[in-house]
Amino acid sequence: MSLIKSISGIRGTIGGKPGDGLSPIDIVKFTYAYCATLPSRKPQPNGGKYKIVVGKDARLSGGMVENLVVGTLMACGVDVVRIGLASTPTTELAVMFAKADGGIILTASHNPRQWNALKLLNDKGEFLTAAEGQAILDLAAAEDFNFADVDDLGHITEHDYTDEHLDAVMALEAVDVQAIKDAHFKVVLDAINSVGGIIMPRLLERLGVECVKLNCDPTGDFAHNPEPLPKNLTDLSETVVREGADLGISVDPDVDRLAFICENGEPFVEEYTLVSVASYLFERAAAIAKKEGRTLAEVTAPYKPVSCSNLSSSRALRDVTEEYGGEYEATAVGEVNVTTKMRQTGALIGGEGNGGVIYPASHYGRDAMVGVALFLSNLAHKKMKVSELKRTYPEYHIAKNKIELSDKGLIDRILEEMKKEYAAEEINDIDGVKISFESKRQWVHLRRSNTEPIIRIYSEAPTLAAAESLANEVIAIAERVINDQN
């Protein structure tokens, strides 16, 4: 059994004793704490009562968790908009569409089928701040309950916001619907037997794309490991080649992450999902600026020609941004950190290297539907194969390693030693320690795990061998620190 409580929500394996797994008791406690802190986040509801949107992915435990969450919300005197099976970005947008005061997404994202989670949203359909999340954790731990009287119980309404979500995607100025239709694309979609199998085929149909469905029945019985990594997408790769498709599309169970497969069955690599979309947006804006004699900033307004991603994401985003005269900003790991920086800088595009695309013209949340529509627009304009498109971007490779420690106290010592060892290089310590070697176009990022005595190590270089070599170099330094303590 596992239960992980964090400022972004609560997740765990279903079953077990309270506090050991995601039990009914934990679900009720956490939902109550979310309700009880509503007035501190939003002193006045939009209507007579506070109203919360609840959406879920297709996990086997989704119905049970949904009933507990909805019942607890009603018991707190909160009205509920139950939207049923829905992607994470659909639920986020539904908060705005319904003029609700918040939302709860029931999904454990890329975690296996035995996991589920509650992810909490504010009245903008965005994740809560660290302070807001901590207040909920504190109240849940206090177990000081006070529920509504019978005359003040909340009520339920039901609505499917899939069409409203798709309407919003189709209406985006940068989505060239006609160009996509004229290209007559054929794609293979792997939706992991979750909600992507509901919404993504409908988007592709509206874009005039022929869709071969793979694992698109939303049973929640995941056909393979749900994280959209190349090693989990062999069936998709083989089907793309067999069907003679233009590309393959893979989404995770809640459809906020996205990965592509080239027409030859090779992975496009999820790090390059955001890179490709950003390159399209900046190239498009630069072309308009040149044609109309305007500045890049004038074309991208009301947004700035800025891109954002976290410290562990590929340098390729920075490269393509600067190629067209834009600026790049790095953030701490975590979607809320990326969206916060995007708001501060007015960024045009942002996201994370795990295939998460955040396009503020739609909303401040990762959205695979937006990512697909922008990627297909890019592909339609470029008139080239996906494998050829991939080769137009700077080539980088990321190696992922970790150091397991018996003493969590060693983490800070190791990170400090890295800063001393590489004092002559560019260092960023907003989230662990990232060391950049500009002349070699390499970097290494060491960051602590929030739940385990582990340092995660991400390194990137123009070749995988160089990335692994850099990781081994910092691991050797870490081992030296560990041995000095023994």
Q: PLM features: residue spans?
A:
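Gly/Ser/Thr-rich active-site loops/lids in small-molecule metabolic enzymes
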Residues: 213-215, 266-285, 368-377, 381
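Phosphate-binding and adjacent anionic-ligand microenvironments
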Residues: 247, 293, 299-486
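An N-terminal, well-structured beta->alpha segment
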Residues: 1-71, 75-76, 155-187
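Proline/glycine-rich low-complexity loops and linkers
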Residues: 83, 134-167, 171, 262-353, ...
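N-terminal small/polar loop signature for handling phosphorylated ligands or for N-terminal nucleophile
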Residues: 36, 40, 44, 50-115, ...
